[in-house]
Amino acid sequence: MPARLIQRKKETIYSDIIKLFFFFTPFFFGLFYEYAACICAVVLLLLLLYLIDRQKKLSIRFNMLLTALLALLAGYLLTPFWAVDSGMALLGFFKFLPAALFWLLLMQLGPEVRERLFLTIPVSGITMTLLSYPTCWIPALTPYFYASGRLGGFFQYSNSFALFLLLGIIPLAFQKKRRFLCLAGILVLLFGILATGSRTVFVLTVLIFLWLCLTRKRLRIPLMLLLAACVAAALLFVAITGNQDTIGRFLTISLESSTLMGRLLYYRDVLPVILKHPFGLGYMGYYYAQGGFQTGVYATKFVHNELLQFAVDVGWIPTLLFAFALLRRLLARKTPAMQRMLLFAICAHSMLDFDLQFLSIFFVLFLTMDPEEGKEIVWQWKKPNRRALFLSAGALAAVCLYLGAALFAGYRKNDALAARLYPAYTPSQLVLLAEARTPQEAEARADTILKRNESIALVWDAKALVSATQGDFETMVQYKRQALACAPYALTEYLDYFHLLRRAMETCQKQGEAARAALYAKRLLEIPDLLDAVKARTSPLAWKIQDQPELELPEEYAAYLNSLQTSDFR
């Protein structure tokens, strides 16, 4: 067999393997979960080793995106030293490790192989839509693919799933062959977008269609007809059912919507934190620390703006490098039209959501970049080099598999196993703390968590309760005030504080300690002032979102405080 034919056959094999990888990864929750990222990292390491072995070399091009990725990974690796939660911060490195490995993989591929990957996006999106939409009629499966009646697909999150479907439309619009088949695919993807109820993606879809109509003249009429047909079908659905929460949700688009006001509230709260912490709070630091700076009612893991998210995670420098790399590619004249459109869609939506936490979307982002840019360094596949590479890759894969097992145990609610395998995994430790059977066990678990993270109200609550059971009411007050600082908008925290103080006051009364009883009575009377202080710091935006602050004591509590104020403890 001729050498050229053998080489072509080899290229076809690894091209098909990579296409299968790219096709299937979105089915694993879009690679959102950390355990999925760990498994993906192992698969990418194997693919890289296979390619390097076939090509007898490793090609690395130092460009702006590689620099930004290395800075991001370095940031996630270093932030545990000063992070809000050192144990969770380390997971950020493994969460985004597949992104760097995928970019390295693209550097080993030829232009033809990379081009073929674009069509995998719509095929994957169409398949996911066709498989997940019918589950609305299968009650046992509905919760896995729908949330609040909105299609979340295999991503289990409607907005980012809708973005992925929109990304599938763009390569189909640029196809010159099989146009009828491509239009049918676009119709399925459009239907999927409407089923997600994502208003932002709907607006973005209209903009992309207008862009396509201006640049793809042959598709102008078919695209407009498809969009009009889908909108008409959605309007008919709303007219018949009266339901505007799913397919017809785009009819509720408003600049005053609770969702948009909530996003603005997140940004308003996090910007001072970013300015104050130029090196970030670490992965998940924003989530755990938000009680200390929030000015409204919300509990969100992500800022819903990826640049702000990276900035609060790892600081200014990696974020600016990453933003510059994307902006440079977006504005470059040599950027092909399809890649520019894909990049624009991802960047635009990522400014209002946490799309890049789904590594499948991160991978599409990398497809729009130029892996052949920059100075090339070729690492030859020699015996000493091979041994070093295999040992390094093997060690990294082993760590990823171990962490992946621990994180998967946590995902499956086997928290005892997750905490044994990775003691610094805070979510599982919190579950075990809540399930503690004795004060001693609760205190030990709380102390373990506090060594890494001092920003969780539940941990301080546990410490306060243990102190109360031991009769150490002064320490109880200190711990409970820490809990209030971590969850200032949780009215239940103030009510719990009320009950503990009342218990302390009544205990002191029974023991004949009038002075101490008066002290706890005074602190009881301070609770409305604590609530008023939180009201004073509350942003006007907080009153424009669905979950508004509840900072008034129930009537029976207020009545008790009124009676206490007129008693001997005044």
Give each language-model segment a name.
Residues 1-78, 84-122, 175-181, 210-225, ...:
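Transmembrane signal-anchor hairpin modules in multi-pass inner-membrane enzymes, especially those
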Residues 15-28, 39-50, 73-78, 93-105, ...:
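Alpha-helical transmembrane segments of multi-pass inner-membrane proteins
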Residues 80-83, 126-163, 191-194, 244-257, ...:
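Membrane-interfacial helix-loop-helix modules of multi-pass inner-membrane proteins that assemble, modify
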Residues 150-154, 208-209, 234-268, 289, ...:
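Flexible juxtamembrane loops connecting transmembrane helices in multi-pass membrane enzymes
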Residues 262-300, 314-320:
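TM-adjacent membrane-interface loops and short helices in multi-pass inner/ER membrane proteins
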Residues 313, 322-417:
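Long, contiguous interaction/recruitment modules in multidomain scaffold/adaptor proteins
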